[in-house]
C-alpha cells in the first residue's frame, strides 16, 4: 500500500501544480471555499419577495396534507442542524420550505441552526459528536459524507427511527437504498433530484435554426448524438462562438452513462468501476468532444467559466446545478432573460436509459443525536412537502414568486428531477477519501474524469490509475464493513 501511495503521489505531483495554480480553490459548484460561508446574502429584491408567507387558501391545503403525518406528541421539539447554511428563512431571505412549515405547525417543532463553514464543517461535526453535544442532523446531499462518515463514527443508521414500509417512507424507498451500506440505511432521504442540468438560451437555439433541446427530449431524441451535433455546428472560435461551459460538466456527462467512478458493491460496500466498459464509453465521448473543440476554453479567460456568454449568444450550453437559476433573475450569472431560459436534462447515450447524476436530499443522522425521533418526523414533513399535490402546489408558487419562474420552467424542472429519481447515479469517491477523490472525480485537469477534457485518452489514464485505485478502495471497503459490524 505504501508503494501504491507513492506512485499516486508522483502522478499528482506532475499533474496538480499547474491546475491548482490556475484554478484556485473551488467547491463542487464552482464557488470559492476560502471564505466563511456561514452567512447567506441575498438581494434586497429577493428578500422583499420572500417576506410573504402562505397565501389565502394555502393554510387549509397544508392542513389536509398534515393529516397524513404521524399523530404523535414530540417531547423534544428542537432538532439541531449543523450546516454551513440555515434552514430558517429569518437568516437566509429564502421563503420558508413547506416541510418546515408543516414541522412547526404539526409538532410545534423548530430547527436550531448550529453554524459552520464549508471548509470546517467536518472538523466542527467531529467536535460536536465527540463532545456529546447532541447535534441531530447534517446535510445529506454532501457527497463527502459516506462511507467515511460511518467509518469515523460520525453518523448512525436511521432504521430504528423510521418505518421504511410505511406509506410516507415508501415514496423514498429507492432513494434510501442509495445510501444503504451493509444492509443498513444511513440517511433520512427526503427526495432525489438532479445534480446538474443543461442551461441554454432559447433565442440562440432559434437563431441557429436548431431543434429546441426540450422538444427533442420530449420526442425521445435528446441524447449524446444530438447534443454533440449541435456543438459541432455551433462552435467557431474565430467568430467567438463557444460550446460547452461549466466547471463540472465532466461529472455530469460521466454520470449520464449510468456508472460512477466509485459505486456501491453488491454486498453493500464500495467498489472501483474504473475498468467498467460503460465508464470507458463516457470518457471516450468526452475525449471526442474535447478533440473537436467543444469544451469552453477557460484557459483563455483566466480559468473562469463565462456563463454570461449564454445570454450574449456566444455560448451554447452550460452544465451546472439548478441553484444557478434558483434565485432572482437579476442575480443569475447566465445573463438570460427569464422568457428565454431553456433547461433540459443532461443527455445520455443513444439507446440508454436517461441516467442522471443524483442529488440525494435529506439528512444524515449524527451519532449521539439527542432527538432522532424529531429528526425523523422533520424528514417525514419534508417528504410530504415534496410529493403531496397540495404541498407541491405551494412549493411551485414559491418558486414562481422567488425565482420568477414560469409555469413552463416549473414543469420542466419537475420532469428533470423525476428522471433523476427514476435513474439516479451517485459517486462515492469524495465519500471514500480526499485521496481517492483527487485521483478520480475532484483532482486536477489531467486526472481521473477530467483527463478526457484535458486531452488525455481514457485508456492511458485507466492504465495509470486502475490498480492503485482498486487497492485504495478495497481498503476503504474493509474499514467500512468493520465499522458497520462494530455498531
Features from the language model and the residues they span:
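Glycine-centered hinge/linker elements that transmit conformational signals in sensory
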Residues: 228-231, 266-300
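Hinge/lid segment of periplasmic solute-binding proteins
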Residues: 44-75, 117, 142-195, 225, ...
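Extracytoplasmic/periplasmic solute-binding protein
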Residues: 80-82, 181-191, 196, 206, ...
Amino acid at each position: 500500500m505504501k508503494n501504491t501511495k507513492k506512485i499516486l503521489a508522483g502522478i499528482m505531483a506532475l499533474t496538480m501544480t499547474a491546475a491548482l495554480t490556475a484554478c484556485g480553490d473551488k467547491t463542487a459548484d464552482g464557488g470559492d471555499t476560502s471564505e466563511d460561508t456561514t452567512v447567506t446574502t441575498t438581494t434586497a429584491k429577493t428578500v422583499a419577495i420572500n417576506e410573504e408567507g402562505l397565501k389565502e387558501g394555502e393554510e387549509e391545503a397544508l392542513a389536509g396534507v398534515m393529516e397524513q403525518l404521524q399523530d404523535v406528541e414530540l417531547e423534544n421539539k428542537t432538532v439541531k442542524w449543523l450546516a454551513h447554511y440555515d434552514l430558517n428563512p429569518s437568516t437566509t431571505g429564502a421563503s420558508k420550505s413547506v416541510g418546515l412549515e408543516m414541522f412547526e405547525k404539526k409538532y410545534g417543532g423548530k430547527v436550531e441552526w448550529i453554524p459552520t463553514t464549508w471548509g470546517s464543517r467536518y472538523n466542527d461535526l467531529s467536535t460536536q459528536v465527540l463532545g456529546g453535544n447532541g447535534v441531530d442532523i447534517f446535510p445529506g446531499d454532501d457527497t463527502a459524507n459516506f462511507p467515511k462518515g460511518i467509518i469515523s463514527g460520525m453518523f448512525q443508521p436511521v432504521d430504528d427511527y423510521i418505518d421504511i414500509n410505511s406509506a410516507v417512507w415508501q415514496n423514498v424507498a429507492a432513494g434510501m437504498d442509495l445510501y444503504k451500506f451493509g444492509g443498513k440505511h444511513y440517511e433520512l432521504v427526503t427526495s432525489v433530484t438532479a445534480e446538474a442540468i443543461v442551461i441554454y438560451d432559447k433565442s440562440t437555439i432559434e437563431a441557429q435554426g436548431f431543434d429546441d433541446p426540450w422538444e427533442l427530449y420530449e420526442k425521445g431524441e435528446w441524447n449524446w448524438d444530438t447534443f454533440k451535433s449541435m456543438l459541432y455546428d455551433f462552435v467557431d472560435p474565430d467568430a467567438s462562438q463557444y460550446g460547452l461551459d461549466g466547471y463540472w460538466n465532466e461529472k455530469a456527462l460521466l454520470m449520464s452513462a449510468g456508472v460512477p467512478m466509485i459505486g456501491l458493491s453488491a454486498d453493500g460496500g464500495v467498489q472501483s468501476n474504473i475498468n467498467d466498459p460503460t465508464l470507458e464509453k463516457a470518457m471516450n465521448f468526452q475525449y471526442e468532444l474535447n478533440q473537436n473543440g467543444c469544451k469552453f476554453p477557460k484557459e483563455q479567460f483566466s480559468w473562469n467559466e463565462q456563463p454570461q456568454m449564454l445570454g450574449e449568444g456566444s455560448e451554447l450550453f452550460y452544465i451546472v446545478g439548478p441553484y444557478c437559476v434558483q434565485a432572482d433573475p437579476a442575480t443569475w450569472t447566465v445573463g438570460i432573460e427569464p422568457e428565454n431560459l431553456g433547461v433540459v436534462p443532461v443527455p445520455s447515450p443513444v439507446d440508454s436509459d436517461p441516467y442522471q447524476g443524483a442529488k440525494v436530499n435529506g439528512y444524515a443522522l449524527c451519532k449521539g443525536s439527542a432527538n432522532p425521533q424529531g429528526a425523523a418526523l422533520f424528514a417525514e414533513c419534508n417528504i410530504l412537502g415534496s410529493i403531496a399535490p397540495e404541498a407541491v402546489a405551494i412549493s411551485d408558487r414559491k418558486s414562481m414568486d422567488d425565482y420568477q419562474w414560469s409555469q413552463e420552467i416549473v414543469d420542466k424542472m419537475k420532469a428533470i428531477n423525476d428522471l433523476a429519481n427514476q435513474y439516479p447515479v451517485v459517486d462515492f469517491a469524495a465519500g471514500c477519501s480526499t485521496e481517492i477523490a483527487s485521483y478520480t472525480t475532484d483532482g486536477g485537469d489531467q486526472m481521473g474524469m477530467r483527463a478526457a477534457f484535458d486531452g488525455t485518452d481514457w485508456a492511458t489514464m485507466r492504465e495509470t490509475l486502475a490498480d492503485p485505485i482498486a487497492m485504495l478502495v478495497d481498503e476503504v471497503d474493509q474499514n467500512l464493513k468493520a465499522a458497520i459490524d462494530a455498531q
